[in-house]
């Protein structure tokens, strides 16, 4: 019984540590978005692209919370917005 409980606990820990990268594509083959999950939480960079292949926006997540710079570009690649986050909260410069 004790071994079964320990085995279940270890299995739950391992599942929670597995990282999975999800990528979706436009019909023309260009990337649409890419994000990384750790268990049920976003964890790592999340990037969106325009259909022309230009980056649209990027933000990093840590344990399901925004963490780091959030950057938005227009279709020509010009940065049009930037915010910084720490532990899910916007940080003033």
PLM regions with names:
Residues 3, 13-93:
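Glycine/tyrosine- and acidic-biased, solvent-exposed loop/turn segments at the edges of beta-strands
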Residues 2-8:
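Sec-dependent signal peptide recognition
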């Amino acid at each position: 019984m004790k071994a079964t409980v320990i085995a279940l606990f270890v299995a739950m820990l391992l599942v929670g540590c597995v990282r999975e990268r999800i990528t979706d594509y436009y019909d023309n083959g260009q990337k649409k978005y890419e994000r990384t999950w750790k268990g049920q939480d976003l964890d790592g960079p999340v990037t969106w692209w325009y259909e022309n292949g230009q980056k649209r926006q990027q933000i990093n997540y840590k344990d399901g919370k925004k963490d780091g710079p959030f950057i938005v570009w227009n279709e020509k690649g010009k940065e049009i917005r930037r915010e910084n986050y720490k532990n899910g909260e916007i940080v003033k410069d």
